[in-house]
Amino acid sequence: MSKLNRACAVVAITGAVLAAAIPGWGAETSVGGVNGQAARGKQLYRRYCVGCHGAKGDGQGENGVYMEPRPRDFTTGTFKCRSTPTGTLPLDTDVYATIGRGLVASSMPSWSALTAQERADLLAFIKDFSPRWAVEKPEPPLAIPPEPPDTPESVTRGGKVYERMECWKCHGKDGSGNGPSATTLTDSKDRPIVPYDFTKGTRFKCGRTNEDLYKIFMTGLDGTPMPSFKDNLPPDEAWDLVHYLRTLQVKVKK
């Protein structure tokens, strides 16, 4: 069999697997007035995503098995970056933003080169992997209060919050992800996972703004050991913690 025929066979098999694997829950998808269509998203997924996330959307793609952290398993309906409470489905805008932004400290790149329509279509197809979208609705997003001034006093208070909430046990005293518990952590699939290193770059796992980091504190990162602190951390202390963590970053761009 020639290389061309083998390539065509792989494409045909992948398409057949995709067709058989996706039940099509028909979840509605709309972002900023752009309605996603799973049929179009299927073709985009085959082109851009199947190599890592797999034909079944379970994160077991041909390339995905070599990646750390592993690609997202869409069949569980569990997502790290959300504006909704822990344990709940994300908003369409949450997943749409992740597609466009990518995920720091992972192999997930930014797909901002795709049009708004293409990203909405891709989102519609991704939602078809999990039955949760057919029976659950995302809860209302977290209300984010206005950010108070980033002052030296706020940073000092944030450092005390970092100590009191024992963030250092995972993220380390200097925020570099080398805490005493770091080597023992596992994700929801019992695979080793490393804490985020706050000292690298100017972005966080789910974005680059202070609001993005605030949301992580209050919603947690589902599928990882990072919990939600919504019930234990008052908003003003969460903002202090944001300001403190900013001081750990190298060459922060104001």
Predicted regions and their residues:
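Short, non-ligating residues that shape and space the ligands of small metal-coordination modules
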Residues: D58-G59, S176-G177, P235
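Bacterial N-terminal signal peptides that target proteins for export
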Residues: S2-A12
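Short, solvent-exposed loop/turn and secondary-structure capping segments
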Residues: G61-G64, M108-W111, A134-P138, G172, ...
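Sequence/structural segment immediately N-terminal to covalent heme-attachment motifs in c-type
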Residues: N35-G54, D150-S176, T183-S188
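Bacterial N-terminal signal peptides
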Residues: V10-A20
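Electrostatic cytochrome c docking/interface patches
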Residues: W25-L44, W133-E163, T202, V252-K254
